[in-house]
């Protein structure tokens, strides 16, 4: 809102409720904008330094309860395919990012399968596919979509752990369009669990945010949780995982992660 429009609205409020009310309301709006700016500034500073500081730890949105409600109520009729930038974008992501880190055979774990748009690619490659989600509805959608697949196991998550998955039992992990909606402290908890369940030499490819004020989209769009490439790498290292690479584009730069400028971090469990 420009200054002239703001003054016009303030005068209207003063006529309707009185000057004191108008001044108080204006102050409240300014205070909220300042609070948001301070929060974004702290998040940016912590993220750039790779520190899980108070701004990240105290992040209020993107809780387990909110995620469970949102994805149980979501319209999964298009199976999550509406989030693909294009069919060629999806095919290139599969060929150039997913398949190189997901070996044929073995046990594959997918965190947050959504409507199963990646599960249908992973299932034929895996000896066993474990899909974990915080909401029951996506698990039902995936089970229906994969039909008679006899290598599928569906697990309901508490939003921060991989309960039901044995230690060092998983060869590879895939998660896309999921961690961007998980609050930072729960992302950290999931990384601890990833370190626990991966076999030595196992690989995980995790798509996550890279800052809240980068890219072409406003910082508050998309119901997204704050994270950064340096912070995610730092959290992974603290849990004994190796960062193999962090991708922002693929197919020789033909495709990327869109307006939010996210990152796919490829992690590896060290050989023991």
What do these predicted ranges mean?
Residues 196-199:
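Short, cationic motifs built from Arg/Lys/His that form the positively charged side of catalytic pockets
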Residues 1-105, 109-164, 182-189, 193, ...:
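Class I (Rossmann-like) S-adenosyl-L-methionine-dependent methyltransferase catalytic domain
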Residues 172-185:
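A short SAM/SAH-binding and catalytic strip from SAM-dependent methyltransferases
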Residues 163-173:
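A short acidic, Gly/Pro-enriched loop at the edge of an enzyme's catalytic core
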